[in-house]
Amino acid sequence: MQLVESFLSIQGEGKYNGKLAIFMRFAGCNFNCLGFNVKISKNDKTLIGCDTIRAVFTKDFKESYETLNANELLKRVIKLKKDFDPIVVITGGEPLIHYENPEFIEFIQMLLKNKFEIHFESNGSIEIDFDRYPFYKECIFALSVKLQNSGIKKDKRLNFKALKAFKNYAKDSFYKFVLDANTLDNSFLEINEILKEAPNQIFCMPMGENEQNLKKNAQKIAEFCIKNGYNYSDRIHIRLWNDKEGV
């Protein structure tokens, strides 16, 4: 498995924000969200995407990844855990592109055997076969379903069958939407469409890869939540550490 980074921090987003957490970020994604417009220069070219570009553009960053097997991944988690009791956040990229990978499966099962609480951060577009892989029912899924502002085509980013499966089978699941203050009317329509087809808890977050851009959106997103009865989630890690990686 290609590991982009691993670190102990706090969960900065969604229903469980503020929780002590070990983050295990795996390489690879099925989306490239150009609409988020985060830019990084690499190998004499400009890469455009979300705030986890290093995990998405695997060809450009592969030399910085670690290749670890399931046992080595577990050892990393135990080392980061120290004597604490953190949750383990499996993130990316899109970690569920690996959900049928034998090495990945072994790692997740090892974590569960060692009594870790596992949270997946996913875009919700990949349907898990919960009958074939029932251990995923013991996990929590934070579903960052992409809206029009991501730049991804609708038929690719919305998989209602997958979203219903997370709600019906997982230990817990919820939506976390990244919203731009300039496109709230469209976002409202999209969110309602998703809720109609696949109801779940909602947490709305302001778009912004750094503290300055986050601040531009935050108040309007909070007011949008109050107006429409949604939960607001700030992005604590950006508030505290701006755009620093590995925190």
Swiss-Prot record:
Its cofactor is [4Fe-4S] cluster; S-adenosyl-L-methionine; Mg(2+). S-adenosyl-L-methionine binds at G93, S144, V145, K146. The keyword Iron applies. Residues 16-243 form the Radical SAM core domain. GO terms for molecular function: 4 iron, 4 sulfur cluster binding; carbon-nitrogen lyase activity; magnesium ion binding; S-adenosyl-L-methionine binding. Its EC number is 4.3.99.3. It holds the Pfam family Fer4_12. It catalyses: 6-carboxy-5,6,7,8-tetrahydropterin + H(+) = 7-carboxy-7-deazaguanine + NH4(+). Mg(2+) binds at T52. Binds 1 [4Fe-4S] cluster. The cluster is coordinated with 3 cysteines and an exchangeable S-adenosyl-L-methionine. Binds 1 S-adenosyl-L-methionine per subunit. It is an enzyme of class 4 (lyase). [4Fe-4S] cluster binds at C29, C33, C50. Pathway: Purine metabolism; 7-cyano-7-deazaguanine biosynthesis. Substrate binds at I10, Q11, G12, R25, T91. Keywords: 4Fe-4S, Iron, Iron-sulfur, Lyase, Magnesium, Metal-binding, Queuosine biosynthesis, S-adenosyl-L-methionine. Gene3D superfamilies: Aldolase class I. One of its GO terms (biological process) is queuosine biosynthetic process. Catalyzes the complex heterocyclic radical-mediated conversion of 6-carboxy-5,6,7,8-tetrahydropterin (CPH4) to 7-carboxy-7-deazaguanine (CDG), a step common to the biosynthetic pathways of all 7-deazapurine-containing compounds. Homodimer. Belongs to the radical SAM superfamily. 7-carboxy-7-deazaguanine synthase family. HAMAP family: QueE. This is 7-carboxy-7-deazaguanine synthase.
